[in-house]
C-alpha cells in the first residue's frame, strides 16, 4: 500500500493579530495610528527604534535595519526558526476549519 502524505497548509488567517502577538512577546507598543514604536529586540536598544504596523505586523528597525512584512517574519527572525516551524509555533500551520 502506498503511503500518502497529508498536506498541512499554511493558514495566514490563523496568525495572531499584531497587537496581541507583540503584547504576548512582552513588548510595549507606544504611539497612535497605523505605526507604533517599541524597543528593538535585535540589538541593544534604549530608545524605541522598532516601528510596527498595526494592521499587518510589518516591522522595521530604524537603527539596525531589521525588517519584515508580518508577525510570522518577526517570529522567524527573533527565534531563528524556518517558515514551517514558526507557522506551527504561531498556530498557523495545518489548522483546519
Please place each PLM-identified region on the residue numbering.
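N-terminal structured subdomain of primase-like DNA metabolism proteins
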Residues: 1-97
